[in-house]
Amino acid sequence: MKTAHEIRPGNVIMFNDSPWVVQKTETTRSGRNAAIVKMKLKNLLIDSSTETTFKGEDKMDVIVLERLDCTYSYFADPMYVFMDSEYNQYDVEAENVGDAAKYIVDGMEETCQVTFYEGKAISVEMPTTIIREVGYTEPAARGDTSGKVMKPAKLVGSDIELMVADFVKEGDKIEIDTRTGEFKKRVN
């Protein structure tokens, strides 16, 4: 059992006698400092969604699910297709992929964790760090060397724009933290 404020996107909880995957959570504090947790939930059995509110201390049953390491194969709208080491393919609905979708690109080498409930793939979790190539960034600003100088950059194969260190150039490979979406370091 977990409290509502410990629940994260990707967790599966029992709610109204059905398993629901948590797609989004938002915690706010009321005037008396009690936490209120709003959750967007998707029912795994009847393919419906709902938004509901819980008190932060409400207890919930979290279901332990099977997880497999898989690699991304291709996108067949509205499904992302992943493959395990034994070449079995698994379809994951685009809305269940969540924020991980922005990091998924053709030819990616990183292994994702696909979560299953009763044999159905229900979510994808990216590794905590990934390596991507910088597709566009401005040249380094001359003379601006005081402190941690950052500039915007776009990645190859995605719409992601993030702030990178001033010394990063087009074509460089960089490491990105998928939890925060922030630049960590240049790799090459």
UniProtKB/Swiss-Prot annotation:
<dbReference type="InterPro" id="IPR008991">
    <property type="entry name" value="Translation_prot_SH3-like_sf"/>
</dbReference>
<comment type="function">
    <text>Involved in peptide bond synthesis. Stimulates efficient translation and peptide-bond synthesis on native or reconstituted 70S ribosomes in vitro. Probably functions indirectly by altering the affinity of the ribosome for aminoacyl-tRNA, thus increasing their reactivity as acceptors for peptidyl transferase.</text>
</comment>
<dbReference type="GO" id="GO:0003746">
    <property type="term" value="F:translation elongation factor activity"/>
</dbReference>
<dbReference type="InterPro" id="IPR011768">
    <property type="entry name" value="Transl_elongation_fac_P"/>
</dbReference>
<comment type="similarity">
    <text>Belongs to the elongation factor P family.</text>
</comment>
<dbReference type="Pfam" id="PF08207">
    <property type="entry name" value="EFP_N"/>
</dbReference>
<keyword id="KW-0251">Elongation factor</keyword>
<dbReference type="Pfam" id="PF09285">
    <property type="entry name" value="Elong-fact-P_C"/>
</dbReference>
<keyword id="KW-0648">Protein biosynthesis</keyword>
<dbReference type="GO" id="GO:0043043">
    <property type="term" value="P:peptide biosynthetic process"/>
</dbReference>
<dbReference type="InterPro" id="IPR020599">
    <property type="entry name" value="Transl_elong_fac_P/YeiP"/>
</dbReference>
<keyword id="KW-0963">Cytoplasm</keyword>
<dbReference type="GO" id="GO:0005737">
    <property type="term" value="C:cytoplasm"/>
</dbReference>
<dbReference type="Pfam" id="PF01132">
    <property type="entry name" value="EFP"/>
</dbReference>
<comment type="pathway">
    <text>Protein biosynthesis; polypeptide chain elongation.</text>
</comment>
<dbReference type="InterPro" id="IPR001059">
    <property type="entry name" value="Transl_elong_P/YeiP_cen"/>
</dbReference>
<dbReference type="InterPro" id="IPR014722">
    <property type="entry name" value="Rib_uL2_dom2"/>
</dbReference>
<protein>
    <recommendedName>
        <fullName>Elongation factor P</fullName>
    </recommendedName>
</protein>
<dbReference type="InterPro" id="IPR013185">
    <property type="entry name" value="Transl_elong_KOW-like"/>
</dbReference>
<dbReference type="InterPro" id="IPR012340">
    <property type="entry name" value="NA-bd_OB-fold"/>
</dbReference>
<dbReference type="InterPro" id="IPR015365">
    <property type="entry name" value="Elong-fact-P_C"/>
</dbReference>
